[in-house]
Amino acid sequence: IDALDYRPNKAARDLAGRDNYVLGYVYDNPNAYYILAMQNGILKECRSNGYELLIHPCDATNPDIIDELVNMVNSARLAGLILSPPLSEMPDVLQAMDDKGIQYVRVLSGDKAPDDKPCVLVDDYQAARQITGHLLDQGHQRIAFIAGEKQHHSTTERQRGFYQALADHGIQADPELVIDGTYSFGTGVQSIQQLLALPEPPTALFACNDEIAAGALFGARMQGVDVPEALAIAGFENSPFSTQTFPPLTTASQPTAQIAQRATSSLIRSLQARKRKAENHTITADIFVPELIVRESTSR
């Protein structure tokens, strides 16, 4: 087989039995860098295990989202799904998948698995505490926070970590320094204008992702604000945005491709266990803690 460089034909293999060798990645996320990293990680694991990948973008707010997903799984004869936020955090979607017997793995924000189903966790809370703690260690006390969409649990976890770090240093969060937004460059631009217009503007800013932080940096520089001397700015995710700005952004490195690869591996193991009818298959939740990366945007 090795000498002939034989590769099993997926279509023939599917027809020969009842096993399917196609996985689906379903997402609703406007962050192109995140989606690309997820796809690369999933594809790497699929290729290593003889699986194909179907990528399906969707709108999580669509009232027919459950029917859309079930029909997609059935028509494509998918073996299982990889779900990322916010779809991975929607109970009605997960319940529908369970009811239909569709296997899936979730990428979730948190440090503890919510149930015994396959998932990979990202500890956004601890990473946000580290970022905020870094800003506090730099001597900042008026620290602003710009949030992403509330339907993403990562937003609430990062905001919770921000609040906890302030509390750890005996500082009460100022509500006028906390702004709700979306995970977008435009949110950063608009929010920094609002913050800089305050009678006492912040001296530091923690943005919920790098795209928001880049927008805030752009908006601050447009107003002649010196970053980091007058305003320190930190983001989250260590996306290409974080190194394409001037100055480069302090951030938390989130190994998205590795997270996606681990999630895919977990799903494939579950599929193989079902095929073997293994009753003692142990499901473990892998936890990733994003790592603080200090760059010039917060270095005085």
Identify the role of each PLM range:
Residues 6, 60-63, 84-89, 211:
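Short beta->alpha connector loops
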Residues 192-300:
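Flexible loop/turn connectors
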Residues 4-72, 79:
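Amphipathic helical "hinge" segments at domain boundaries
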Residues 28-37, 55-65, 109, 119-130, ...:
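Hinge/beta->alpha junction and helix N-cap segments in small-molecule ligand-binding domains
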Residues 24-26, 77-85, 144-146, 178, ...:
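Periplasmic-binding protein-like
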Residues 65-126, 153, 157:
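Short beta-strand-centered segments that line the small-molecule binding cleft or hinge
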Residues 64-78, 188-201:
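Short, well-structured alpha-helical segments in soluble
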